Amino acid sequence: GFDKQKIKIEDFSLKPVEHHVWMNLIFVKLQNEYYDIKKTLTKIEKIISPIRFDQYSYHSRVSYKINCNWKIYMDNYLEGFHIPIVHPKLNDAINYKSYKTETFENFSLQWCHIKSQSSPYKKSSSNQKAFYFTLFPNILLNIAPGRLQTNIIEPIDALSCNVHFDYYFLDIEPNQISKDINFSEDIQNEDIDICERIQSGL
């Protein structure tokens, strides 16, 4: 057996993992580098108020293998000028003239008003806006009325990446959920096409 008096349990324990729970979402940091995710999420919470995700229900995950460097995908997400050209359905669903980009420490925000008559999202009298947050370096939060979509961009190698979409909904009918997911699928396929074209041209 072991001499309990000579063994220090703290020398053999698992390494502690820093984490933060925010509106039922769990953020985990494995590296020792300083990054105050709580500060970032508190700012985001104020921006999107009164929206809260505590009562949203997890629906599903859709993953995509994309033949481009992960930074190309991030750059495409952060640049909204291509929307009227690459995403005609999305352009019809939003008020592109209201589209704005704001930058903060460790995250950025793109947001715009939604055209309720042509939007695939839940109709909301209190909030008809779409929020697109980028959390450095590779987490995206896409927020529309009644829906949260998180994106995790996972590098594979210099020429490819995985992108994981996780859907959360608040009291939405199944047909409305299908409409939302199908709409996102169309937009994602358009983004995949342009990202892979950019990669092939580098």
Can you annotate each of these PLM segments?
Residues 1-18:
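Long, hydrophobic, well-ordered secondary-structure blocks that form the structural core
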Residues 20-202:
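C-terminal catalytic domain of Rieske-type non-heme iron oxygenases
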